[in-house]
Amino acid sequence: MARKTNTRKKRVKKNIEAGVAHIRSTFNNTIVTLTDTHGNALSWSSAGALGFRGSRKSTPFAAQMAAETAAKAAMEHGLKTLEVTVKGPGAGREAAIRALQAAGLEVTAIRDVTPVPHNGCRPPKRRRV
């Protein structure tokens, strides 16, 4: 029986000018996803995916690196302008936005979509260190 040659599909270059950057910044990690205007993902990155572990994962520097990697990958698809939606209370919020601008993407709007409870679940107890 003949062996199949292992051919990888080449990634299709989409030609998308405008998109949305979804930044999810928690106390433990920062995830950056760049999508087109319909919400189809072009690229994503996170502090954990870049090899940051433990307490270094939640730093602004890790968020900056995640945003840079996602931006470079999305710019290969022709992305130029962005709307930014930020969710969560983490340390990497501003750093990720600044990194997207520094990568050469034009930020047109910044929207905070952090979910705020109308007195829903009881929050976790206070830490005593």
Curated annotation (Swiss-Prot):
PROSITE patterns: RIBOSOMAL_S11. One of its GO terms (molecular function) is rRNA binding. GO terms for biological process: translation. The keyword Iron does not apply. InterPro entries: Ribosomal_uS11, Ribosomal_uS11_bac-type, Ribosomal_uS11_CS, Ribosomal_uS11_sf. SUPFAM superfamilies: Translational machinery components. The keyword RNA-binding applies. Located on the platform of the 30S subunit, it bridges several disparate RNA helices of the 16S rRNA. Forms part of the Shine-Dalgarno cleft in the 70S ribosome. Part of the 30S ribosomal subunit. Interacts with proteins S7 and S18. Binds to IF-3. This is Small ribosomal subunit protein uS11. The gene is rpsK.
